[in-house]
Amino acid sequence: MRTENTATLNLIWGALILEELARLGVQHVCMAPGSRSTPLTLAAAQQTKLQRHLHFDERGLGFMALGLAKASRAPVAIITTSGTAVANLYPAIVEAWLTHVPLIVLSGDRPPELLGCGANQAIVQPGIFANYATQVNLPTPDAHIAPQALLTTVDEAVANQTRPVHINCMYREPLYPSELSGVILDAESPYLKPLQTWLQLARPYTQYGKSKQLSSPSDDAIMRFVHGKGVIVVGTLTPEQDPQQLIALSQKIGWPLLTDAQSQLRQHPAAIGNIDQLLQHPKARNLLQEADRVLVFGGRLLSKRVIGYLAEQNWHSYWQVLPEQDRLDPSHNAKHIWHANAEQFAALNWYRSSSANWANTLITYNDELHNLFVRNIDQGEFGEAQVIRAIANTRPLEQQLFIGNSLPVRLYDMYAPVSCCTATTYTNRGASGIDGLLATACGIAAHEGKPTSLIIGDLSQLHDLNSLAIAKGLSSPLVIVILNNDGGNIFNLLPVPNEQVRSEYYRLSHGLEFGYAAAMFNLPYNQVDNLADFQDSYNEALDFQGASIIEVNVSQNQASDQIAALNLWVKQS
């Protein structure tokens, strides 16, 4: 076999990796500029099966990939150069690992002889993501290593993977070929001779069967489980699990459906969406305490009240349904975990409960809260909850929501309106950081071009200001709604010892507005301080083919004061 020169062989290895990833279901590749990753970059530039996305900031790049993977329900590749470029992906990789989102990091690296000797931009990259990624360390490209070995290495690491994989790619110089031929994977190349059949086909070199096994209870177990007073709690579910099937399940069994903000069912009229607030409603809480059976779909519940309810009840039977093997119960209840998605589990042979409709009064209490929120939020003072309810009520079938962490997602969970339907809803609630939220929303918006709304706090937006560059490149509607309450005002809800400490060390008031940031990236911008102006700006932004910013200015105490007042009313109901 003729020995390929270094630059050409580097490029062939890069092309083999990207071609195999495309065959394994990857649709998008996110790339940051850098020299050591040149073989991967040049291969990606000529790969026609992948959509390419570029950004200069690797932290934002990782979160954009996270959003693309969430929206496409497929793995996304990320290409970076060596050094701290790789380290900047860490927050996104952590979030992806915790929420089972498949990201594939392809990091360029120095060869072994340039590590630990003071060579430029060289750090120890294998294992950099610790327990948050499956690690694959490739040697420097070598003509004595069969190309089949490279393909089977990629296949074994990526096939059926639901979490991040880090493939570290060492390259020796020269990195740049003297010229780029039209076809990198040339069938005439002696090195590729063993892959002649693979080159003519479109399937992966190794085809793995699906490894997921559905676990489900027997008919007899189901009959015994539903014999009593029970509740169905729906936590975080992804849209592809078809959560709508849980409405029919709830009605068939005759148990109430208690829905989290991330359930895709929070606003459904047949669900008890106001469960967080109902748990401080005396009559509703007393009724819910009669339940002795619980069926939980998903995990990562947002409401501390719901988590507390699940922890405090003396459950006769506790079932949890998860699509992956996970431990998602901070209260450590004794339970039976079934491995299935929501749609599969709802399709089992369910029976009517012997105590069907035992909690129908919850519907009345839920409706009472709905009316309370209409009067005191929708028809009350302009504020954060009012804006969130207005967004949730606007064109839910036409758009998708990404709700930021800290206060926005909690306000949605507490006060989202009941409506005909719920927009497809995304969050980053694995590690629940405030970093990368705009970049994630950009990835979600970029996948299929569906109008997308991001609800984000001011500190979260400041944290991800660089990602306005990604937003600038979008050609589909992305409405960035910034709730600017001048600092981290979720700390108003927490028992910080005194107001001075809260202000100086937690809230971090900044006095900044976002108009100049919008101008810097040439994005349409509106600043509003009343509901009518917000609704006009919001509807206009949903029809704009690109990203735009609406800044909502409210006082530091508006949301916390309103929450306190509503809590008082609910407790006195």
UniProtKB/Swiss-Prot annotation:
GO-annotated biological processes: menaquinone biosynthetic process
PANTHER family from the UniProt entry: 2-SUCCINYL-5-ENOLPYRUVYL-6-HYDROXY-3-CYCLOHEXENE-1-CARBOXYLATE SYNTHASE, PROTEIN PHYLLO, CHLOROPLASTIC
Record's function text: Catalyzes the thiamine diphosphate-dependent decarboxylation of 2-oxoglutarate and the subsequent addition of the resulting succinic semialdehyde-thiamine pyrophosphate anion to isochorismate to yield 2-succinyl-5-enolpyruvyl-6-hydroxy-3-cyclohexene-1-carboxylate (SEPHCHC).
Catalysed reaction equations from the record: isochorismate + 2-oxoglutarate + H(+) = 5-enolpyruvoyl-6-hydroxy-2-succinyl-cyclohex-3-ene-1-carboxylate + CO2
Assembly description: Homodimer.
Keywords: Magnesium, Manganese, Menaquinone biosynthesis, Metal-binding, Thiamine pyrophosphate, Transferase
GO function terms (MF aspect): 2-succinyl-5-enolpyruvyl-6-hydroxy-3-cyclohexene-1-carboxylic-acid synthase activity; magnesium ion binding; manganese ion binding; thiamine pyrophosphate binding
Family named by the database record: Belongs to the TPP enzyme family. MenD subfamily.
Co-factor: note: Binds 1 thiamine pyrophosphate per subunit.
EC number, as in UniProt: 2.2.1.9
The name this protein goes by in its record: 2-succinyl-5-enolpyruvyl-6-hydroxy-3-cyclohexene-1-carboxylate synthase
Pathway(s) the chain acts in: Quinol/quinone metabolism; 1,4-dihydroxy-2-naphthoate biosynthesis; 1,4-dihydroxy-2-naphthoate from chorismate: step 2/7; Quinol/quinone metabolism; menaquinone biosynthesis
Names of required cofactors: Mg(2+); Mn(2+); thiamine diphosphate
Keyword Transferase carried by entry: yes
UniProt cross-references to NCBIfam families, sorted A to Z: menD (TIGR00173)
Matching CDD domains: TPP_PYR_MenD, TPP_SHCHC_synthase
Domain of life of the native organism: Bacteria
